[in-house]
Amino acid sequence: MTDLTTSDSTQPAWQTRDHLDDPVIGELSNRFGPEAFVVQATRTGMPVVWVKREQLLEVMTFLRKQPKPYVMLFDLHGVDERLRTHRQGLPAADFSVFYHLLSIERNRDIMLKVALSEKDLHVSTATKIFPNANWYERETWEMFGITFDGHPHLTRIMMPQTWEGHPLRKDYPARATEFDPFVLTKQKEDLEMESLTFKPEDWGMKRGTENEDFMFLNLGPNHPSSHGAFRIVLQLDGEEIVDCVPDVGYHHRGAEKMGERQSWHSYIPYTDRIEYLGGCVNEMPYVLAVEKLAGIEVPDRVKTIRVMLSELFRINSHLLYISTFIQDVGAMTPVFFAFTDRQKVYDLVEAITGFRMHPAWFRIGGVAHDLPRGWERLLRDFLDWMPKRLDSYVKAALQNSILKGRSIGVAAYNAKEALEWGVTGAGLRATGVEFDVRKWRPYSGYENFDFEVPVGNNGDCYDRVMLKVEELRQSLRILEQCYKNMPEGPFKADHPLTTPPPKERTLQHIETLITHFLQVSWGPVMPANESFQMVEATKGINSYYLTSDASTMSYRTRIRTPSYAHLQQIPSVIRGSLVSDLIVYLGSIDFVMSDVDR
């Protein structure tokens, strides 16, 4: 692990910085000249550099080939800049595209931005440098109308092929009431059905060769092994997969667009629905990013409570993943065991938050309320129960010779391939890369906890599922420390932008009463800036990149989810394998479609 510099570790997370002291700024200036860039000061915690469109690919290639390279395109998307009022010192732009690159060896990130005019929405594709740019560029074109020249297949990915318009543009309606009433005529229904017909030629596939015809099989979007509304079109030669095309978007709900119409506070419940098994884990990156904008430092008790709830939901999600993986391989019983154990997690979560799957319990500056009396006993009972149950899963199912035979060596990939496709979480650690955000870039007090990061070597299905078992043990270890070392103190920060403000002060001071009224009715106004927060979520790295224009609502909410990148990788891994191997591979990825489609 590469430590961040002393200046990084001592500066408050919310301080606005230009990061000119980051070595990469000097490297870029030496290579391209200081006049080639505009460095933007933000609260993202990384250098944000505006580059000229003509130099973009050259700059990305340079960073990709440095001695300590930026090996992963972590995220790529766009921003409609036309209504943004706080842009002092930035290049003129109607739209912009940002490229978030990550370096494992440096443990650092950099964000490149390109300014575009509405009359010339073109930029070169980055797919030849980072193959995972494919889906991100398709989505950016679909949402903003920005064309990526040279892209191999620039078509819609989230919306139906018949959709008109670019939904994340500021002039595109955000609510159904702003559209004309929807009417599905028989003719339109036929057109919609026709658009779903898979045409191999559109994807560069052949229907057959001189000697044989290929079969095309739709797996999903309603199939128990597709783990949600997900279609994957298989090109088969007998049982062998020649090629495949994942088809996503059936679960798309416009989560990022909703962020532009909800207050900073009222958007919290929407975060729970991004990865619906993650609960409070989903809320963590959002509230931390908002707190960076606001300049809020939360009490230690809040940090530890957030860690405790996050690890409870991590255990809950991992239990479902392990049991359904075993079911995909062919064993039924562990699923019923797992739901018994998950019920205990939900009972504990419900006792603390009042809700089960979607608690919406974290707040800007704290949590909704303090821990209830008796929480220690409930947590103690669970910590005494769970370790033995984990042992039974391993002994009864995961050491089974049939399961091993179907998963060892299946759908294996190495660290280089994982990084090229943006794989994070257990999928990356199974290849031997010990990258866990909780350890490498601690947040919410994780630096105060003693736990290990399990790592695999083979990068196959069996490694991925066994890593999750070990991660469960480490989560129990973290919960044990929460039980023994829960700090005293308030459950909210004493800050003007804490939302909602402490209610007990509203009847004593007119100023706090006014603040309470405004923040509960209209919502708090966050300072104009940009912030970013990534967390180690249940399925990989989840992050929020927020842009504030000094309003009660976000100007741009970008949600980067791990499952999106993981599904894009499927064709490169599964070509040449059997259909039965694909089922095991899908079960080993650990995804839900709400996390993919947002």
Swiss-Prot record:
<dbReference type="InterPro" id="IPR023062">
    <property type="entry name" value="NADH_DH_suCD"/>
</dbReference>
<dbReference type="InterPro" id="IPR029014">
    <property type="entry name" value="NiFe-Hase_large"/>
</dbReference>
<dbReference type="InterPro" id="IPR014029">
    <property type="entry name" value="NADH_UbQ_OxRdtase_49kDa_CS"/>
</dbReference>
<feature type="region of interest" description="NADH dehydrogenase I subunit D">
    <location>
        <begin position="213"/>
        <end position="598"/>
    </location>
</feature>
<dbReference type="Pfam" id="PF00346">
    <property type="entry name" value="Complex1_49kDa"/>
</dbReference>
<dbReference type="GO" id="GO:0050136">
    <property type="term" value="F:NADH:ubiquinone reductase (non-electrogenic) activity"/>
</dbReference>
<dbReference type="Pfam" id="PF00329">
    <property type="entry name" value="Complex1_30kDa"/>
</dbReference>
<keyword id="KW-0472">Membrane</keyword>
<keyword id="KW-0511">Multifunctional enzyme</keyword>
<comment type="similarity">
    <text>In the N-terminal section; belongs to the complex I 30 kDa subunit family.</text>
</comment>
<dbReference type="InterPro" id="IPR010218">
    <property type="entry name" value="NADH_DH_suC"/>
</dbReference>
<comment type="subunit">
    <text>NDH-1 is composed of 13 different subunits. Subunits NuoB, CD, E, F, and G constitute the peripheral sector of the complex.</text>
</comment>
<dbReference type="GO" id="GO:0048038">
    <property type="term" value="F:quinone binding"/>
</dbReference>
<protein>
    <recommendedName>
        <fullName>NADH-quinone oxidoreductase subunit C/D</fullName>
        <ecNumber>7.1.1.-</ecNumber>
    </recommendedName>
</protein>
<keyword id="KW-0874">Quinone</keyword>
<keyword id="KW-0813">Transport</keyword>
<dbReference type="GO" id="GO:0008137">
    <property type="term" value="F:NADH dehydrogenase (ubiquinone) activity"/>
</dbReference>
<dbReference type="GO" id="GO:0051287">
    <property type="term" value="F:NAD binding"/>
</dbReference>
<keyword id="KW-0830">Ubiquinone</keyword>
<comment type="function">
    <text>NDH-1 shuttles electrons from NADH, via FMN and iron-sulfur (Fe-S) centers, to quinones in the respiratory chain. The immediate electron acceptor for the enzyme in this species is believed to be ubiquinone. Couples the redox reaction to proton translocation (for every two electrons transferred, four hydrogen ions are translocated across the cytoplasmic membrane), and thus conserves the redox energy in a proton gradient.</text>
</comment>
<keyword id="KW-1278">Translocase</keyword>
<dbReference type="InterPro" id="IPR022885">
    <property type="entry name" value="NDH1_su_D/H"/>
</dbReference>
<dbReference type="GO" id="GO:0005886">
    <property type="term" value="C:plasma membrane"/>
</dbReference>
<dbReference type="GO" id="GO:0030964">
    <property type="term" value="C:NADH dehydrogenase complex"/>
</dbReference>
<comment type="similarity">
    <text>In the C-terminal section; belongs to the complex I 49 kDa subunit family.</text>
</comment>
<keyword id="KW-0997">Cell inner membrane</keyword>
<dbReference type="InterPro" id="IPR001135">
    <property type="entry name" value="NADH_Q_OxRdtase_suD"/>
</dbReference>
<keyword id="KW-1003">Cell membrane</keyword>
<dbReference type="InterPro" id="IPR001268">
    <property type="entry name" value="NADH_UbQ_OxRdtase_30kDa_su"/>
</dbReference>
<feature type="region of interest" description="NADH dehydrogenase I subunit C">
    <location>
        <begin position="1"/>
        <end position="189"/>
    </location>
</feature>
<dbReference type="InterPro" id="IPR037232">
    <property type="entry name" value="NADH_quin_OxRdtase_su_C/D-like"/>
</dbReference>
<keyword id="KW-0520">NAD</keyword>
